Swiss-Prot record:
The lineage of its organism: Bacteria, Pseudomonadati, Pseudomonadota, Gammaproteobacteria, Aeromonadales. Involved in the post-transcriptional modification of the uridine at the wobble position (U34) of tRNA(Lys), tRNA(Glu) and tRNA(Gln). Catalyzes the conversion of 2-thiouridine (S2U-RNA) to 2-selenouridine (Se2U-RNA). Acts in a two-step process involving geranylation of 2-thiouridine (S2U) to S-geranyl-2-thiouridine (geS2U) and subsequent selenation of the latter derivative to 2-selenouridine (Se2U) in the tRNA chain. Keywords: Selenium, Transferase. One of its GO terms (biological process) is tRNA wobble uridine modification. The gene is selU. It comes from Aeromonas hydrophila subsp. hydrophila (strain ATCC 7966 / DSM 30187 / BCRC 13018 / CCUG 14551 / JCM 1027 / KCTC 2358 / NCIMB 9240 / NCTC 8049). This is tRNA 2-selenouridine synthase.
Length: 366
């Protein structure tokens, strides 16, 4: 087995989007993998668990023997055909298991005996993951970071779409970063969030980019946690403050979190099934703020929200949502933002309206 080829240029694998065949069990794949990987496991979750138990109780030799017993005969033939079929679709695919050990060595040998020789990752998933963590850490330490901040509803995410050097953290997290930030479809695992972020940074730095603009985020974007080195770099980075009137911000929130999000629920689930899910999303998001708002303020806001939802369900009109949105900005989000900004004013390098901030970023890049 040792004479068969190894893949060791991890940067090139990610830069070129080399297809990967992940031979780990489905439970391992679900915890974290890579965007170009396909899970075609050597063993099922149950088979892996049996082999693991055998290893603990009887040692390596017995565990290997059990593995060959479980994945032998017709099972081996069926799985081998699955790997061969994938390699017919993606003939340049590379194999990996967790550590580059027996699982990937075994499959590599079986494929070789079937007439197909493909490299395996020398250190497996563990080495690829370490490479991407180091990539993130290096980017956090070596790149120039600028943070775009502004009151809730300022349209910062929309602005970043017009900034060439923007890095969309919320896009990678599939979450808008507030109590109302949950999006239909759920979030990636934290490992996948980090992996995808690292790969984007690797590719962009390979193209020569060294300066990035990110939106002001807390450590957690939904359930996705920013890597400590990146969060620390953002916490010390210069700030650009976008200034938007409250009326305009309330309208932006209505558009993003009511009108557009309802369309996403409708597209994903259909109108009949999607409506109660959408209404529950808004209601639950407000409920998560109850402790900070206090019972009375929460009741007042919830009453306004339920009236707005009833009108929307009846007529399709979403304008009543502006009442609770404006009150929530006034009572909660705006005071919280002003307090937080007061603790970091010394980091502000520019502030102005949307166009002024976009012009600043364009000049910064030039």
């Amino acid at each position: 087995m040792s004479a068969l080829p190894l893949a060791t240029d991890y940067a090139r694998i990610f830069l070129d989007d080399v297809p990967l065949i992940d031979l780990r069990a489905p439970i391992e794949f679900k915890e974290g993998a890579f965007p170009c990987s396909t899970n075609l496991p050597l063993m099922t979750d149950d088979e892996r668990a049996q082999v693991g138990t055998c290893f603990k109780q009887q040692g390596q030799a017995a565990a290997i023997a059990l593995g060959h017993q479980l994945v032998g005969g017709a099972v081996r033939a069926e799985r081998l055909e699955g790997w061969l079929a994938q390699l017919r679709r993606q003939p340049d695919a590379v194999l990996y298991c967790f550590r580059g050990g027996l699982r990937s060595q075994t499959v590599q040998q079986w494929l070789h005996e079937a007439g197909v020789t493909r490299p395996r990752i020398a250190g497996g998933y563990k080495d690829l993951r370490r490479f991407l963590i180091d990539t993130l850490d290096g980017a956090a330490a070596e790149c120039q970071w600028t943070v775009l901040t502004g009151m809730t509803g300022s349209g910062k995410t929309h602005m970043l779409a017009e900034v060439a050097q923007a890095l969309d953290l919320e896009g990678h997290a599939h979450h808008r970063g507030s109590s109302f930030g949950q999006l239909p479809g759920g979030q990636p695992s934290n490992i996948n969030f980090e992996n995808n972020l690292a790969i984007e940074l690797l590719k962009r730095r390979h193209q020569g980019e060294q300066a990035f603009v990110v939106e002001d985020e807390s450590r957690l974007i939904g359930r996705c946690c920013l890597p400590n080195p990146l969060f620390d770099a953002m916490s010390q980075a210069p700030l650009v403050v976008v200034e938007v009137p409250q009326e305009e911000r309330a309208e932006q929130i209505r558009q993003d979190y009511v009108h557009d999000l309802w369309l996403r629920y409708q597209a994903m689930f259909g109108a009949e099934e999607g409506w109660p899910l959408f209404a529950a999303y808004l209601t639950d998001a407000l409920a998560r703020l109850k402790r900070r708002l206090g019972d009375q303020a929460h009741r007042e806001l919830d009453t306004l929200m339920q009236s707005a939802l009833a009108e929307q369900a009846s007529s399709g009109d979403t304008s009543l949502h502006l009442a609770w949105i404006t009150l929530l900005l006034t009572r909660y989000y705006d005071p919280m933002y002003l307090y937080q900004l007061g603790n970091k004013r010394e980091r502000i390098i520019f502030q102005g309206d949307k166009q002024a901030c976009l012009d600043f970023f364009a000049k910064q890049r030039a």
